[in-house]
Amino acid sequence: MAGAVLAGFAVVPVANAQPPKFPDVDSYPAVDLAEYQVIGAHPSMSGWVFSTPGGLRCQSNMIADLGVSCTGPIVGAATDMNSVAVSLTKPGLIARYEQSPDDHSYPLLPTGSKIAPGNGVVCAVLADDALTCRAKKPDSWPKDTQDPPDRHYGEHGFVVQPSGSWSY
């Protein structure tokens, strides 16, 4: 699911300077996860899907390392950017992604709400045309959880908004 989406990104450099104040995603009310959950044959094919009023279609994976990816109009970015993603192990990425049409229906995440499935990823719809997602170690993990030898856990995120989309 999200892992497959992340594999097809065309890398486009985006400046990742010290981010402006990141929105407080924790202050938004959470939706009922059951309405957004999808179950696949493997945990990497399972997670949560949602759409935004601004036309983004997002997939958050059950496996915390895989994070969340969204496709659709990335307002506030270069005109050909159509994808944004972030995970526990990789900084946010705004990119152009060659994609085949997806005719699946994704439930709407309403403006002023968040989806917080407990996998370390939290996304909130700030306004009809603005989305933010943050990925960090899940609260359920012990504080002393060690990084795997091949990657580093950290806090990463992105903001998609008309005044300028950015990631860290």
Predicted regions: what they are:
Residues 1-18:
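Secretory targeting and sorting signals
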Residues 13-16, 33-49, 53-55:
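Long, hydrophobic N-terminal alpha-helical segment
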Residues 18-40, 64-111, 151-168:
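A low-complexity, Ser/Thr/Gly/Pro-enriched, surface-exposed linker/loop concept
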Residues 45-77:
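Short, surface-exposed binding/anchoring microloops in extracellular/periplasmic proteins
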Residues 100-141:
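Acidic, glycine-rich flexible loop segments
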Residues 127-168:
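Extracellularly exposed regions in secreted/surface proteins, prominently low-complexity, repeat-rich
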